[in-house]
Curated annotation (Swiss-Prot):
Transmembrane segments: none
Cellular-component GO terms for this entry: extracellular space
Leader sequence residues: 1-19
Annotated organism of origin: Solenopsis sp. (strain B0-178)
Subunit structure: Homodimer.
Compartments it resides in: Secreted
The protein's name in its UniProt record: Pheromone-binding protein Gp-9
Length: 153
C-alpha cells in the first residue's frame, strides 16, 4: 500500500512539474526564429510574457500597452518568419497545416476548430502586432481549456 501511494505521489509531482515548466516558458520560445526576432525588435526575454501569464489572462491586466504591443510584435515576427503571416494577414491554410502537423492532430480534433475560431476573431484587427498577440493568446487559452487527455501528445 505504501508503494502504491508513493508511486501516485511521484506521478502527481512529475505531472505538476511538467505543467509548471510549460507555464513558465516564454511565449514563442520554442520556435526557430525566437532569438532573431528578439534581436531585430530590440526586445529581451524578460520583456516577454510567460505562457502561464497568457493562459491566465494576466498579460491583459498587469502590463502596460507598450509591453503588450512589443510581445505582439515578437509573435508577428515569428509567424512571418515561419511563412504563416504577411504583415497583418494570416496565411490561413498554411497556418492550419502547420498547426495540425506541429500538434499531431487528426481530422475532427477540437483544437482545429479553436484555431479557426481564433483566426476568425482576429481577422479584422489591422495592427499586425496586436492581432498576433490576441491570436496567440486565443489559441493558448483554448488549448488550456481542453481536458488533459486531449492536450499535446
Amino acid at each position: 500500500m505504501k508503494t502504491l501511494v508513493f508511486h501516485i505521489f511521484i506521478f502527481a509531482l512529475v505531472a505538476f512539474a511538467s505543467a509548471s515548466r510549460n507555464s513558465a516558458k516564454k511565449i514563442g520560445s520554442q520556435y526557430d526564429h525566437y532569438q532573431t526576432c528578439l534581436t531585430e525588435l530590440g526586445v529581451t526575454e524578460d520583456d516577454l510574457f510567460s505562457i502561464g501569464e497568457v493562459t491566465s489572462g494576466q498579460h491583459k491586466t498587469k502590463h502596460e500597452d507598450t509591453k503588450l504591443h512589443r510581445n505582439g510584435c515578437v509573435m508577428q515576427c515569428l509567424l512571418e518568419k515561419a511563412g504563416l503571416m504577411t504583415g497583418a494577414d494570416f496565411d490561413e491554410e498554411k497556418m492550419r497545416e502547420n498547426y495540425i502537423e506541429e500538434k499531431g492532430l487528426q481530422p475532427g480534433d477540437q483544437r482545429i476548430d479553436f484555431l479557426n475560431s481564433c483566426m476568425e476573431q482576429t481577422k479584422d484587427i489591422e495592427d499586425k502586432c496586436d492581432k498576433s498577440l490576441i491570436f496567440i493568446g486565443c489559441v493558448l487559452m483554448n488549448e488550456v481549456s481542453l481536458p488533459a487527455s486531449n492536450e499535446e501528445a
